[in-house]
Swiss-Prot record:
This is 4-hydroxybenzoate decarboxylase subunit C. The enzyme activity is enhanced by Mg(2+), Fe(2+), Mn(2+) and Ca(2+). No stimulation is observed with Cu(2+) and Zn(2+). It comes from Chlamydia pneumoniae. GO terms for cellular component: cytoplasm. Keywords: Decarboxylase, Lyase. Its EC number is 4.1.1.61. Optimum temperature is 30 degrees Celsius. It loses above 50% decarboxylase activity at 40 degrees Celsius for 5 minutes, and above 25% enzyme activity remains after incubation at 50 degrees Celsius for 5 minutes. Optimum pH is 7.5. It catalyses: 4-hydroxybenzoate + H(+) = phenol + CO2. Belongs to the UbiD family. SUPFAM superfamilies: FMN-binding split barrel, UbiD C-terminal domain-like. Signal peptide: none annotated. GO terms for molecular function: 4-hydroxybenzoate decarboxylase activity. It comes from the Bacteria.
């Protein structure tokens, strides 16, 4: 029995998976059912009757921390920590003996050719992507998408592989759009191929193996294979077969395999797509994928997910990945003690780190090191402190930094930097800025707890998010940032956040992170008075004002359309006739 089917049986027995037999449309309806269930911390869903396809669809497999922990039970949480300790320790025979299980895992790295195992796939007689139950998740999506694709490519110069998760849009029966990004492996491989005027072979796996999914999103160094990482975590090699008409290994752990190529120089409008930032990423030209063959298991199950505002499945699997990788950060970046990127902000928008300060401004050196490390280089706001704070409580992190931050030296802004493709707060696609907030050493100020001032012109409501951070409800028409910077009632507050809706912004840490850091760019939206320039930098003064209002150039928030909302509400008991515990 495959890994996926074992866990389907396990979760079904634990009432952590529900079979849905009612007919369900993959166009908006299925995604809305999924969203309601995951919001209520509900079970995984196996849809057996998806309109227009003979294949069942599995969603919400990663929808709770409990299920994620079970899915990765083969790889204990301390696995990477033990490897990091072994690498950084003086080698001793006794320690090697105690770590012999790790050596066994290392012997399991890589792929294994399935010489005697039956090939578990059948090939479609003709390529027709319409037979697959691709989801349209949001009303303004540009079409139907693969939402859990594992896209495999190899460098045409070094043959090093990459397994990445890039969304894939269906254009017609044999053509798709590849949302490759230049700063990630697949995009780099296509760039290399195009320099040689070659087409790039591409394989797309749809797999129920969670270790492949986790590895595909892992921010590994360019020369580290995601497949090797997956086999280390699962403690077993990946079986594969090669065919004469395609250069890539066909992984036995897949449910579907799409093989083809990305033609050199071919681009096509892709999107819009409601993404994991909670907004629509807009239509842009991206590479094409020409599908030449489709393989699938005879009893194939189509894995899918739905992304949007937090919390969705990407949040839980992203946090699991950080649990695994966190012991490696001090090994790769010796100045880092702990580091966390916040899934509530889409991960790349906000990162916080506890660092060492063993010499003058080592913390700055470490901050720059973080911003130069792989996918961490896409970080937009970086919060740095040398205090032992719980990074999973952002309000405590922010208070710790604001107690220590010296405005004339501890705010550093970099303009004209690379930006996450999905983040539209910069001047144009892939362009943005970065901001570093540093709070090092002993506290130098007491932070205000509550607002004691009067009404402020153009401000509808005022309340603190935490000590030292005040949120002001205003609008693009009413805001006057210059007057706020000079307002006497705000002088004691180090940080001011401008928000469209105060109560929704401060109702939870999740909402504060999402509404603040996905709606601003350091260079454009962080404002502060500066008394003078010295040594090629401005000397800032408090308060810092972050304008987190929705701007006209930003994409819209993803929202369910009324007809889909009504349809799902009316049909709820058809999906779940036994009235499960999650809400309607």
């Amino acid at each position: 029995m495959s890994f996926l089917r074992r866990h389907i049986s396990l979760f079904r027995s634990q009432k952590q998976l529900i079979d849905v037999f009612a007919p369900v449309s993959p166009n908006l309806e299925l995604a809305e059912i999924h969203r309601r269930v995951i919001e209520d911390q509900g079970p995984a869903l196996l849809f057996h009757n998806v309109i227009g396809s003979s294949f069942p669809v599995l969603t919400n497999l990663f929808g709770t921390k409990h299920r994620v922990d079970q899915l990765f039970s083969q790889a204990p949480d301390n696995l990477i920590a033990r490897v990091a300790h072994l690498i950084s320790s003086t080698p001793k025979l006794s320690s090697l003996w105690k770590s012999r299980d790790l050596l066994k895992r290392i012997s399991s790295l890589g792929l294994k050719k399935a010489r005697f195992r039956r090939f578990p796939f059948v090939s479609m007689s003709s390529v027709n992507l319409d037979h697959l139950p691709l989801l349209t998740s949001w009303p303004e999506d540009g079409g139907a998408f693969l939402t859990l694709p594992l896209v495999y490519t190899e460098s045409p110069t070094l043959t090093t592989p990459n397994l990445g998760m890039y969304r894939v849009q269906r254009f017609n029966q044999n053509t798709m759009g590849l949302h490759f990004q230049i700063q990630k492996g697949g995009g780099m491989h296509l760039y290399e191929a195009e320099q040689k005027k070659q087409n790039l072979p591409v394989s797309v796996f749809l797999s129920g193996n969670p270790f492949l999914t986790l590895s595909a999103i892992a921010p590994l160094p360019e020369n580290v294979s995601e497949l090797l990482f997956a086999t280390f975590l699962q403690g077993a090699k990946l079986l594969y077969k090669k065919t004469n008409d395609h250069p890539h290994p066909l992984l036995y752990d897949a449910e579907f395999i799409l093989v083809g190529e990305s033609p050199a120089g071919k681009r096509r409008p892709e999107g819009p797509f409601g993404d994991h930032f909670g907004y629509y990423s807009l239509q842009h030209d991206f590479p094409e994928f020409h599908c030449h063959k489709i393989y699938h298991r005879k009893d194939a199950i189509y894995p899918a997910t739905v992304v949007g505002k937090p919390y969705q499945e990407d949040f839980y699997i992203g946090n699991k990945l950080q649990e695994y990788l966190s012991p490696l950060f001090p090994l790769v970046m010796p100045g880092v003690r702990r580091l966390k990127s916040y899934g509530e902000s889409g991960f790349h928008a906000l990162t916080a780190a506890v660092v060492k300060e063993r010499y003058w401004r080592e913390s700055l050196t470490t901050a720059l090191r973080i911003l130069g490390e792989g996918q961490l280089s896409l970080t937009k706001f970086l919060m740095v402190t040398d205090q032992e704070v719980p990074l999973d409580r952002f309000s405590v992190v922010l208070e710790t930094i604001l107690e220590r931050l010296q405005p004339d030296r501890d705010l550093i802004i970099f303009s004209e930097t690379a930006n996450d493709t999905l983040d539209y707060t910069g001047p144009s696609l892939n362009k943005g800025s970065k901001g570093i907030f540093m709070g090092i050493g002993k506290a130098i100020r007491d932070l205000p707890h509550g607002y004691q001032g009067g009404k402020i012109h153009g401000v509808q409501d005022i309340a603190p998010f935490c000590r030292g951070c005040l949120v002001l409800e205003t609008s693009l028409e009413d805001r006057c940032i210059k007057s706020l910077l000079h307002h006497p009632d705000l002088k004691s507050w180090p940080l001011i956040i401008l928000a469209d809706n105060l109560r929704e912004t401060i109702q939870s840490e999740k909402d504060f992170l999402w509404r603040t850091f996905t709606r601003c760019a350091p260079a454009n939206d962080l404002h502060a008075l500066h008394s003078h320039f010295a040594t090629h930098r401005p000397n800032y003064n408090f308060p810092f004002v972050i304008d987190a209002l929705m701007k006209p150039s930003y994409p819209k928030e993803v929202e369910v359309d009324p007809s889909t909302k009504q349809k799902v509400s009316e049909r709820w008991h058809a999906y779940f006739p036994n009235k499960e515990t999650f809400y309607i």
